[in-house]
Amino acid sequence: MTSLSRDFTDKLFADYEANAKYSAIENAVTHNGLLKSIETRQSAVENDHVFSIDLTKDEVSNQKASGRCWMFAALNTFRHKLISDFKLESFELSQAHTFFWDKYEKSNWFLEQIIATADQEIGSRKVKFLLDTPQQDGGQWDMVVSLFEKYGVVPKSVYPESVASSNSRELNQYLNKLLRQGAQILRDLIAGGADQAAVQAKKEELLQEIFNYLAMTLGLPPRQFDFAFRDKDNNYQSEQNITPQAFFEKYVGLKLSDYVSVINAPTADKPYGKSYTVEMLGNVVGAPSVRYINLPMDRFKELAIAQMKAGETVWFGSDVGQVSDRQKGILATNVYDFTASMDINLTQDKAGRLDYSESLMTHAMVLTGVDLDADGKSVKWKVENSWGDKVGQKGYFVASDAWMDEYTYQIVVRKDFLTAEELAAYEAEPQVLAPWDPMGALASK
């Protein structure tokens, strides 16, 4: 190992002081902040909110201080369909309802994983991975499908937000305390020679305590409910004693098994045209595992465009914090110019960023439009976020095509847009990725 010498540091001082530009940038950044000082005008000019395909202008939702983006994105895709089908002015499905059942199922999932790894040392990487974050707010498309198919959905007016759903930090803090404590109890039981029946009985005791905690913090979810609404033509409709499952079937009416997850992960360990799953990633025990097919970016975008041309929005996962202006709602690789202003060259490619932990999937949103050039190629994309209407253009963002190439990792599209070869690859036995793989990161944050 080589230490930093005084002579070397003196040289760095001299080189910096010899460049007058650095002094000007220093003054700008220390007074205004880094990103505001190097933001480009051109990124705003190029990324206006006009799109050749524009599917919705519905009001945006707001996940507030929670990590429920994946739920919001899925429920938003349903919401647009429901507003259109039933001629509604506006409408939201309850994100808190899905949140409750996700917490409940994730608790059981975690405890079952603890039982399954009870023969491993407490310091093993997998056990440590489980205990570091027993559960959290994040998730994946296949996980939210499992929740919808088991528990249905309800209108937001039937099961509204609570303090804990809108700001989940305290909820998670104490739920994870209960789960870590439960993990110790179960591991100690198994180490002491308890049989499977005794372990499962204890797990059920723990889950009763957890269920009570969730009901007291989020509210007890309805088993059935009444619901009434008026459409844009002032026609009155109502439902009495409908279950969440029946509401999903009647008002959403989608066969979720018709949809598949497509990823773009150009790393050496994930060849294109293959299917993948992630070990230990899930929420509902017994539900189908999370599954993706990895495809090149050109094909990835082609599928997203095809679905929007057919009139349907697209759930997608990305690394939203990368080179983005949250307030203006601009996602563009040229939004900040580090090279011209600071002589800093950020040259790492998409594969390198994934391999070296610089990027991963952090946020799910909805593609609701795209601007195509004369050749049918995408120029920029309309993005429905779930951060409320005070950012972007009333909550909608715009992503440049280059940003999509570099920082988008997943879309969900109908199976019938895939070729027979692609569908066969998706349905083949998947390669199992490590629990900490970046393609599972959306569900572990």
Task: Give the location of each predicted region.
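Short His-Asn-centered micro-motif
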Residues: 72, 316-319, 368
